[in-house]
Amino acid sequence: MKRMLINATQQEELRVALVDGQRLYDLDIESSRSEQKKSNIYKGKITRIEPSLEAVFIDYGMEKHGFLPLKEISKNYFPENYNCDVRLNIKDILREGQELIVQINKEERGTKGAALTTFITLAGSYLVLMPNNPKIAGISRRVEGSDRIELKELLSSLKIPEKMGLIIRTAGVGKSIKSLQWDLSLRLKHWNAIKKASKKKSAPFLIYQESNVIVRAFRDYLRQDIGEILIDNPKILDIAREHITALGRPDFINKIKLYTGEIPLFSYYQIESQIDSAFQRKVRLPSGGSIMVDTTEALTAIDINSSRSTRGADIETTAFNTNLEAVEEISRQLRLRDLGGLIVIDFIDMTTISHQKIIENKLREIVREDRARIQIGHISKFGLLEMSRQRLSSSLGESSHHICPRCTGTGTIRDNESLSLSILRLIEEEALKENTYEVHAIVPIEIACYLLNEKREAVYAIEKRQAGGKTIIVPNKNMKTPHYLVSRIRKGEQIRSMSYCLSNVRKNKIFNNIKKEIVDKKHKLNSTLTNISLSDDSFDKQKEEKEKFLRKKNYNNSIINALFNNKNLFFKFIVWIKNSFLKKHIFVKNESFKRNIFQNKKNILFAKKEEFNSIEEIHKKDNQVSSIDNNKKKQLLNKVKKNNNHQYSHVFDNNTKYTSLKKIDFQKNTIDFELNSLNFLKKNNFYIFSKYNFLYTKKYAKNKFKDFENIKSQNDMICYESFQKDLENNTSFKKKLLYNIIFNNCYPNNILVNINSTIFQIYKNSEFFKFFPIKISILMTPLNIFSLELILEPSSKKCSSFKENQVKKRLRINNYKKLNSSFIHKKNNFVKNSVLWPKKFTTEEIKINHLYKKNKKNTKSYFFETSFKYKTVTKNISKLKVKLTSKKNDYLISNQKKLFLNKTLKKENTKNKSSAPITKIFSDVFLSKNQKIMNSSIFLKKSNKKIKNSAGAHSATNFSTSPVKKSE
């Protein structure tokens, strides 16, 4: 028994299947993402007339204009008194801007617009009305014999209006004249409503939309041989009963039933696997053979293969049986896939002509059940049969498939070697053109590896012939073969860019095609080096609070305010120090620093002062740290020198005070005023300097109160002394120190911070210094460490923080620290929990000049072998030699990325230096949302000799999925 199965369990897709027992022979799928437009009626206007095509283009409200040929234009739109016997000229018939009522005859396909017609067809249950085509009046071609004679008599009895055509459908067989006249009256009302609606509005707009898949299925597929209609959705069941009554098919109401089984409807009738075969290229035959279906722009090719088929006594019989079996499957697949247009079938060669005739007749007999019009030819001497099938709607592949972006629908791609050689030839062609400055090639990683390794000599030869020009090859992991992009940069069309994480890279206008959000991440923005608090409040809120209290006037700091009145001179001095001294002597001359810079490794540590976001008593100038005099003799850090054993020694100048980095642990809780100040005097104190941004603790060897007034600053550095014994025993002295302390030759605007949340302000030339107890919690971060290149380039905002936690005492080092590092910036967790572990200790005696005693004092130096853990990657670092000047509270501070502990730098072999292009592939983390890439042009400028003989500086970034085209 034949059934109509309607599956509506998924609201995005509604499927209608026609089955004969458990064999699927027709399928219609309607999806919410692909709405059918065929048979829709629009009011459009002519936008362009093409006499060469004898057609016009119609704007009917869609993106692509419709195509209307002259043969599809009704005479109702011809001018009056036009002589149709003369050769027609489309410009004499129609004009631009003229409005027409059109119907979609063929839907859009690829780049082609929809095919339109002015011959409107209104399909009903029993007949089809053509209101503006009087030439057509007849009966469906499927009706034969006595039924056809009977319908002709009924057709002559129908009252058809003038200048209208009519076709009686197969469903009209056996119906009375009254039923046919009732259906005709409905179609006439429909046409009158369309004409009335078209006059209310100007073109373009939609007048009538074709019914949904359920109505179309009832109208087109319902025949008397359909035994039952099963629907698995109660809501669709009610809608189906309403539509079938409106269509005038009350005889099918009792056949509509609700399916309530536990097994899905299509699975129960075992048709899911048959539906899947309609999406496959290869379809198996029961005997073991197969058919291959390939659709192209011009036609659909179907190839028949015997495969494992062994049916038949000889090869001729096997070929005949396989072809006969394939004919039935081909006719079914044409209906399931809804393939239209030209179809070519390649049969297995048969020498017997009678077998060929049987195959042709079998195919003609089977396709009679198809609703589409089909024309079939004969099998040629090459074994090919040509046939055409009417396009009823978009095929299953067009509505549910999309073209592969990699192979563009061909199914094959070019191999890597052939593609690489083709790109190399294109690079050479572009490089040898006149006025060429650079040639950029953005290629997949596989192609880049081949060009930079196998063809490095060829790339270098191209650069030589280019007379100084560069060839930049950029691997892009988001690009897959066979896609690539080769662009030529002319000398007069240079655009500065920060692409590929290189400086001074220039790109042409193709750069504008890259996605905007990716470009913004790579663009260098002017910003300042800021310190962000690790508080619960947002950064914007903290910034607002900071600006609020900075606006408040502090009358206690008039001397400091006077100093900062001349801002230009002060900041020019700071900029001059950075540009002339630090960049010249540290970056350029020091090979270790240059290496680390080009590898984006932050190896030099600097502690940045803390920002007090909630202090009202301290003026803006108080919260800044003044710099000391720029004296080269007092450098805190000299060049890093190499030893024969590949160890690095942290050496200080003899005239510089020996200091050690100490822990700052700001407390959140408010401490009593007297206790706070007393703890400050008893314990170690901290000083912050902005020139080198190092945090130091100063201690005197003298511990007597009588020497206090005689202490003076040495080497232009602020001094302070801990008087533990005297303070503990002299209570009167404690009280006195709560308010002022004698202090000589202090530098202005230096802030002393105690571990108990007390801030001390040093006054210039005042012989005393004050402190301000904080009555609220200070929102402070731990000790902030910044790399040297960030200090020199204030446009960068990336920073990191290090928090120290006490661990057990190990060997001779007291309070050795475990260092945990993390970025302050939110969403910028680049390295998490990098740990510096002590593994090996050795000692040796080193004599140095003591700070305040004339005699010399021996100190100990320790060696550490360290290991950093970056997530799952472990990197071993070379040994570091650090001088410790105190046995108490000395800590080793480390950065999150190798710091001073750079990898062991072996001696450079200049003789065997390769001239190959240098390729650097960076991680996605450098393109994180909040990170600002700094411009390293100054570093590249100082190291031109390193890349002078290379084939080009190469780098890989994930800046875009570049368009695949060649730029001129």
From Swiss-Prot:
It holds the Pfam family RNase_E_G_Thio. It comes from Buchnera aphidicola subsp. Schizaphis graminum (strain Sg). It is an enzyme of class 3 (hydrolase). The keyword Nucleotidyltransferase does not apply. Zn(2+) binds at residues 404, 407. Its EC number is 3.1.26.12. It is a peripheral membrane protein. Its main location: cytoplasm. Residues 947-968 are annotated as: Disordered. Keywords: Cell inner membrane, Cell membrane, Cytoplasm, Endonuclease, Hydrolase, Magnesium, Membrane, Metal-binding, Nuclease, RNA-binding, rRNA processing, rRNA-binding, tRNA processing, tRNA-binding, Zinc. One of its GO terms (biological process) is rRNA processing. Residues 39-119 form the S1 motif domain. Residues 955-968 have a biased composition (Polar residues). GO terms for molecular function: magnesium ion binding; ribonuclease E activity; RNA endonuclease activity; rRNA binding; tRNA binding; zinc ion binding. Its cofactor is Zn(2+); Mg(2+). Endoribonuclease that plays a central role in RNA processing and decay. Required for the maturation of 5S and 16S rRNAs and the majority of tRNAs. Also involved in the degradation of most mRNAs. Binds 2 Zn(2+) ions per homotetramer. Belongs to the RNase E/G family. RNase E subfamily. This is Ribonuclease E.
